Structure formats: C-alpha cells, structure tokens
C-alpha cells in the first residue's frame, strides 16, 4: 500500500482517511522498509498534509499506544510540534509546570529532540526526572502530583519502525504534527504550538475529528511554534 500511496503523493494527490490509516498501519507493524518510510514522509511533506490524512495516521497511533490512566479530569497537554528551527528553550515543558501549579492536571506528552536542539525529554532528564517511568508510575504522578510525563518512544512502541528514517532525514515530518495528537492519557484539552501558520486550521480540524473538547492551536508570526512575544500570534 505504501508504494501506491507514494505514487499518489508524487502526483500531488491527497490520500483519503482510509488509505492514510492503512499506510500508518503498514509502517507501525514493520511492513514498510526504511527507504519507503523516508520516501513517503518526504513526498507527503512536499504535497502538504490534509485533515483526513493526519486524522487517519493519528487514529492508528492512538490505537497502538500504551494507555495511561490516572489524574483528575479534565487532563491538559501542552505539546508543540517542534521543528521551528528557532533554537529556543523548550517552552512547552516550562508551561506544563506553570499550568500544573495553577491546579490543572497535566499529562505532558513528549520526546527527545528529533529536528530541534532540545526536546521535552532532554530537559526533564537533565532535571533528574525518570522520563522512562512505567505507565503505572506516570498514572500515580498524575494522581498525586497533578503532572506526569509520557515519553513517546516508551508508550508508542510501534513507532520504533519510523525512528531511523526520521533521524536520518533530520527535518520535520508529519510525525512532528502527530506527536501532540496522540496523547496516551487521552487528554482532550490541549495547547498545541505548530511550526507553520497554515497548520493552525489543519490541526484544529484534526482535533475536532478526533473528539477534542477544548484546544488552542498557535503559531508565532516570527516562526515560533509558540505564542510569541515579538509580534502577533495566530490562534
């Protein structure tokens, strides 16, 4: 299926939700080679991702994630796409502590740096946090501390098939977009920063299709995948 999908993308044709679902299933079950995965990611980025494509991918990733239970509802996540190339500190992780301190339960989803200098897991590991804590421990953190960190590689085991191609490409791909959409705790209230202005409406459409309750999708006019302090921000 992935070969046919690559051909469609190279012809500047969108994939429907069912096809996107099938391709991600093939990737996450080890049915695609590294070359096919890399080719697919580049072709998709060149064409541009649609709501249906991202929704189909996210549905598969959510279904295959190790679930996290715990914490007082509603759960909140502050997870940006990364990939803005700005070299700023990891703002979403700092925000997670502020939000938790304000009384919200924060189920923070994140990873090590893939296309940026510093990911959420890198920051927390330097602070002495066990970023690879068991699902039970993360759930206990949500219950007792009101904040827990969910390390994407530990909870999205099927993603192992895409790690190599992503790292070798060294550039942002649809997986940057998918990270904030596949929270293992099922957080339905989110603040998501995106690396490109056109993604604000696309991501909002995907969140609606996936059943989110409340969400802000933001992009700074200076290119940040955050609300910026140097000019207007798109929300």
Where do the language-model regions lie?
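Acidic, glycine/proline-rich low-complexity segments that act as flexible tails and inter-domain linkers
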Residues: 1-87, 102
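Electropositive phosphate-/nucleotide-binding environments in soluble metabolic enzymes
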Residues: 3, 14-21, 31-38, 48-55, ...
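Short beta-strand segments at enzyme active-site cores
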Residues: 36-37, 106-109, 217
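Core alpha/beta catalytic barrel or barrel-like domain that forms the active/cofactor pocket
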Residues: 69-79, 107-113, 175-178
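A generic, well-ordered mixed alpha/beta core segment in the N-terminal half of proteins
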Residues: 80, 84-141
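Glycine-rich anion-binding loops and their surrounding alpha/beta cores
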Residues: 8, 14-15, 63-68, 88-89, ...
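Short glycine-rich loop/turn motifs that provide flexible caps or phosphate-binding loops at active sites
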Residues: 11, 29, 47, 79-82, ...
